[in-house]
């Protein structure tokens, strides 16, 4: 049939962002007959429910060359595809597509921006207010709706932004995914694979390894705790954006036996089951999703 399928585009900075937060949304549109497109920096991760993947690098770097390149790429994608809806996530993954859309004549796709925590808030570094605040304020006029996930963001947006503002209570987590039964033998197998013995006290912090998540703080904490609890082990499942810097730090500080860098994992619910305690060291998160998940 020549009935054109409705198309939706999701944008975010990294592939891993989709895996962590957006699978239910991708599935929803796929189940409702949309052709689902995704634009983000390619990390070689298979994204489910995605019909077409564009590799666009919406970096956090304020490098003009990078920004221009991603701007040109996404503008071309928007012109060629006539999306019914564009769902934007992460500051630059949302800013660059909206900027591109604002420069397209007769552009009529709906744009929804989900702010998973604005980078400007009471007590945020001044530089954040100088960069992100004017950017978000300016771009809000090219946005049909902004969805915020906490009160402070909602109130700031209500006062300052030119767009419909909504608030949802957090981004939600999938209960079924975490309400799993893990058999004793599965746990044993996983412990063995991760080289964890029975008397180990296991901490876990799932999340991308980056400066904002501040995992180095946990390594320093382990160094102190190790004196009291020699059998302590920290699991760090997550894509490494610091190019092995943290591993080196662990080695230099004699923590290599106490920290497991697991890379990107799909079995977080199982890993939580073999851990004694979930921890978080993020500098900028309200109620971190990993603490709720545990």
Regions found by a protein language model. Give the residues of each.
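N-terminal strand-loop element at the rim of the active site
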Residues: 10-67, 152-158, 167, 241-242
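Short His-centered aromatic/hydrophobic patch
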Residues: 88-94, 115
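Donor nucleotide-sugar binding/catalytic pocket of nucleotide-sugar-dependent glycosyltransferases
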Residues: 54-55, 137-187
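Nucleotide-sugar donor phosphate/pyrophosphate-binding loop at the beta->alpha transition
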Residues: 20-21, 65-72, 110, 120-138
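Aromatic "clamp/platform" in nucleotide-sugar-dependent glycosyltransferases that forms part
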Residues: 264, 283
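Membrane-proximal helix-turn-helix segments that form the acceptor-binding/catalytic region
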Residues: 27-31, 129-146
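A conserved mid-protein helix/loop that constitutes part of the nucleotide-sugar donor-binding site
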Residues: 19-24, 201-227, 234, 241-247, ...
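Nucleotide-activated donor-binding/catalytic signature segment of Leloir-type glycosyltransferases, i.e.
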Residues: 247-263
């Amino acid at each position: 049939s020549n009935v054109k399928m409705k198309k939706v585009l999701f944008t975010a900075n990294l592939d891993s962002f989709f895996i962590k937060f957006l699978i239910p949304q991708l599935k929803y549109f796929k189940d409702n007959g949309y052709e689902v497109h995704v634009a983000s920096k390619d990390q070689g991760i298979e994204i489910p429910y995605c019909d077409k993947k564009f590799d666009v690098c919406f970096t956090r770097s304020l490098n003009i060359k990078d920004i221009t390149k991603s701007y040109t790429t996404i503008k071309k994608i928007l012109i060629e595809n006539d999306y019914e809806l564009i769902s934007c996530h992460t500051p630059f993954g949302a800013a660059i597509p909206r900027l591109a859309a604002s420069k397209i004549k007769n552009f009529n796709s709906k744009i929804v921006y989900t702010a998973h925590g604005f980078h400007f808030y009471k007590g945020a570094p001044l530089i954040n207010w100088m960069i992100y605040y004017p950017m978000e304020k300016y771009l809000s006029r090219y946005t049909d709706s902004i969805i915020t996930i906490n009160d402070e963001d909602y109130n700031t947006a209500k006062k300052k932004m030119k767009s419909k503002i909504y608030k949802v209570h957090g981004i939600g987590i999938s209960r079924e995914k975490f309400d799993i039964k893990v058999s004793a033998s599965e746990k044993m197998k996983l412990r063995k694979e991760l080289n964890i013995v029975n008397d180990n006290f296991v901490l876990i912090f799932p999340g991308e390894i980056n400066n904002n998540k501040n995992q180095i703080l946990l390594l320093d904490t382990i160094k102190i705790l190790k004196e009291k609890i020699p059998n302590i082990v920290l699991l760090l499942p997550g894509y490494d954006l610091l190019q092995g810097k943290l591993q080196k730090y662990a080695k230099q500080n004699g923590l290599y036996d106490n920290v497991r860098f697991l890379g990107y994992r799909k079995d977080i619910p199982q890993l939580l089951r073999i851990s004694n305690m979930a921890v978080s060291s993020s500098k900028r998160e309200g109620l971190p999703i990993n603490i709720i998940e545990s």
